[in-house]
A protein has these predicted regions:
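A surface-exposed partner-binding patch
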Residues: 1-106, 162-242
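Short acidic-hydrophobic sequence patches enriched in Asp/Glu that either
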Residues: 127, 154, 219
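Compact, glycine/acidic-enriched structural inserts
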Residues: 109-146
C-alpha cells in the first residue's frame, strides 16, 4: 500500500550523483478540510489508497524531485488529452508526472510523464506507489534510474520514432471493436495512440504536428487521435472574404 511505503521511506538516506547526502522528510498529513476540498473537485470518489496515504503525508518536504505532492500540484493543461489530470510531481522545468483520473475510478494508476520539450506523453509507472519507490531508489539523474530513463531518453525516442502509432485505415480494419469504433469517427489522415495497456517505453508525441496539433480522445478510453491542425486562412483569403 502507498501509505505503508510512505511511512517506510520517511527519513531515508538519499545520495545524489555528486555524493551529497540528504534525508527524506515528509510533509504533514492532510487536514479534513484539505481532503474535503480535494473530493469536491474530483470527477469520482477519492480512492481508499489515496485517502490512507493522505493520512500519512501530503508529499515530500525535500527529496530528489522539484516537488512531489498528493494534493494535486495543478498547473498542467492539455485538457483535450487529459480531461481530469492530477499532477503529483514536477521537475522544475515545466514538465509534470500526472495521473489520468477517470470518472468513477477507484484506482489511480498509471503514472504518465507529460513533457513539453519534446511535446510527449510517456508511460512512467503502473502506480503512485511504484513511482515513489523509483524516485527514492536512486538519484533521478542517475542513468540507471527509471525516472531518468523516461525523462532523458524515452521522451526523445517517442518524438523521433512514431512507428507505434496506428494509422486510421489500419485501426478501422482492426479486430479490436473499441479501436475500430474510434477509427470510424476519424478522417483517414489521423493516427492513433493506444495506451490502454501501457508498457515501459510507450507513449506518444502529443505535439507531433506542432503546438496546434489536434488531439481527440475516445471517451474515457486511453486512445488518442492526433491530426494536423486545420489550416488558417491566409491574409488575402481573409481580406476578400470581407
Amino acid at each position: 500500500m502507498l501509505a505503508d511505503t510512505l511511512k517506510a521511506i520517511a527519513g531515508q538516506r538519499l545520495v545524489d550523483t555528486d555524493g551529497d547526502v540528504t534525508h527524506l522528510e515528509l510533509l504533514p498529513p492532510a487536514t479534513e478540510q484539505q481532503v474535503r476540498a480535494l473530493e469536491a473537485k474530483l470527477p469520482g470518489p477519492l480512492p481508499d489508497e489515496i485517502r490512507s496515504a493522505l493520512a500519512v503525508t501530503t508529499g515530500f518536504a525535500n527529496g530528489p524531485l522539484e516537488s512531489f505532492a498528493l494534493l494535486d500540484l495543478e498547473g498542467f493543461g492539455l485538457d483535450d488529452a487529459f480531461p481530469h489530470p492530477y499532477s503529483i510531481a514536477h521537475d522544475g522545468y515545466g514538465n509534470y508526472w500526472i495521473l489520468d483520473v477517470l470518472p468513477g475510478a477507484t484506482d489511480w494508476g498509471p503514472v504518465f510523464f507529460a513533457c513539453h520539450d519534446p511535446a510527449v506523453i510517456a508511460y512512467q509507472a503502473p502506480s503512485i506507489e511504484q513511482f515513489v519507490k523509483d524516485v527514492v531508489a536512486m538519484a533521478p539523474d542517475d542513468s540507471r534510474s527509471p525516472i531518468n530513463r523516461v525523462h532523458e531518453t524515452v521522451v526523445h525516442t517517442l518524438w523521433r520514432d512514431q512507428s507505434a502509432l496506428i494509422r486510421q485505415p489500419a485501426a478501422a480494419a482492426s479486430s479490436d471493436p473499441t479501436l475500430r469504433e474510434f477509427a470510424e469517427c476519424l478522417t483517414p489522415d489521423a493516427v492513433i495512440a493506444d495506451l490502454r495497456d501501457p508498457r515501459p517505453g510507450s507513449g506518444f508525441a502529443w505535439g507531433m504536428y506542432g503546438p496546434r496539433t489536434d488531439i481527440q480522445r475516445f471517451g474515457t478510453h486511453r486512445l488518442w487521435a492526433l491530426l494536423r491542425p486545420a489550416a488558417k486562412p491566409g491574409f488575402f483569403s481573409r481580406m476578400f472574404r470581407k
